[in-house]
């Protein structure tokens, strides 16, 4: 589909080095929530080798990464090595930072720096270059401490309103109701995703109503099944506009019902295939 947000959604395609099979060698078993039979949470462990320059510390092992963290801290920031994404993931979990909003805040800042809307004078001397793994680690530590430029990043999508960025920065912010887009897809490609994010009840949160099955080819090839699934005529192509309101409304109602009974979104009908 070419629908992956790269460098704050400036591009929609990235390198194959972050494909799923390249993470298999770092998997250290599976885990799950208490009494959940699915056990969908991968464990990771990074070896200490001269190639990846990974030291054995608290961030060399942990849970994940999931797709959102992979997208936000991989292509979203110009990173193409699995070891770096895994380490960022473990840092985020240890520091208690949300990977979606934090990754988006850093990507936004990097594009503003790229375009000259902010300079080293605004960042405390930091050069916000895409793909700089050491810089990203430093930014995470600064953010959690609200130290230096980390104070601006911690303001997240509200940095303009709080006087940290110029008003022109809003043209490069992927957010709704002050909340950054929570998934790494480029929603301009998948029209149902775009509509869902625009009307979501909690900012740009894909977990409220995302029509995940729009990217399932088998479902799109069966018009009758798709009609019954969403209770309305929905165009087969993810890039078409027709009928996507039926799919978004159906998903929002189903997900709200799942939330009401405490059901994990990944086990909720319509969210996963």
List each language-model region with its residue ranges.
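Extended C-terminal regions of large enzymes
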Residues: 1-273
């Amino acid at each position: 589909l070419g629908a992956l947000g790269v460098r704050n959604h400036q591009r929609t395609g990235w390198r194959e080095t972050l494909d799923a099979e390249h993470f298999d060698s770092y998997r250290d078993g599976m885990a799950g929530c208490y009494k959940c039979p699915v056990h969908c949470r991968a464990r990771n462990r990074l070896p200490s080798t001269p190639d990846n320059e990974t030291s054995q510390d608290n961030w060399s092992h942990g849970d994940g990464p999931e797709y959102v963290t992979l997208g936000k801290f991989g292509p979203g920031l110009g990173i193409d090595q699995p070891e770096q994404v895994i380490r960022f993931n473990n840092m985020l979990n240890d520091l208690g930072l949300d990977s979606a909003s934090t990754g988006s805040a850093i990507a936004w800042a990097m594009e503003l720096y790229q375009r000259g809307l902010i300079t080293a004078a605004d960042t405390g001397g930091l050069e916000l270059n895409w793909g700089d793994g050491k810089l990203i680690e430093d930014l995470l530590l600064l953010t959690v401490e609200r130290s230096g430029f980390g104070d601006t990043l911690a303001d997240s999508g509200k940095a303009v309103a709080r006087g940290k960025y110029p008003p022109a920065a809003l043209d490069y912010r992927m957010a709704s109701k002050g909340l950054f887009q929570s998934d790494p897809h480029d929603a301009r490609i998948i029209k149902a995703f775009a509509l869902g994010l625009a009307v979501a009840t909690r900012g740009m949160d894909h977990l409220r109503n995302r029509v995940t099955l729009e990217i399932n080819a088998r479902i799109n090839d069966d018009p009758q099944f798709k009609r019954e699934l969403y209770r309305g005529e929905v165009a087969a192509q993810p890039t078409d506009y027709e009928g996507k309101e039926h799919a978004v409304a159906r998903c929002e109602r189903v997900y709200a019902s799942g939330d009401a009974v405490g059901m994990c979104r990944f086990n909720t009908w319509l969210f996963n295939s």
